[in-house]
Swiss-Prot record:
Name of this chain's protein: Translational regulator CsrA
GO terms, biological process: bacterial-type flagellum organization; mRNA catabolic process; negative regulation of translational initiation; regulation of bacterial-type flagellum assembly; regulation of carbohydrate metabolic process
Single GO molecular function: mRNA 5'-UTR binding
Family classification: Belongs to the CsrA/RsmA family.
Record-linked Pfam families: CsrA
Protein localization: Cytoplasm
Record-level GO cellular component terms: cytosol
Domain of life of the source: Bacteria
Organism: Borreliella afzelii (strain PKo) (Borrelia afzelii)
Role of this protein: A translational regulator that binds mRNA to regulate translation initiation and/or mRNA stability. Usually binds in the 5'-UTR at or near the Shine-Dalgarno sequence preventing ribosome-binding, thus repressing translation. Its main target seems to be the major flagellin gene, while its function is anatagonized by FliW.
Gene: csrA
Amino acid sequence: MLVLSRKVNESIKINSNIEVLILEIKKDTVKIAIKAPENIKIFRSEIYEFIIEENKKSILKDKHNIGKIKSLFNHYFKNEN
């Protein structure tokens, strides 16, 4: 992990296409701006964790639903013969 100190209006570059600019420092809060290409997704960590958890729940539901659908197909095709 790289640890840097920056002052207001100073920035860091990540590769050549991402810049993190320090806009404001107040007590225990730092306001930053991130300039990055549109195809780079940027999330606050708590939002990212929420998205991951929701995706996991969705996958579990899908697995359950696929099992139900498979069972219905098997039942249907057994009755066809």
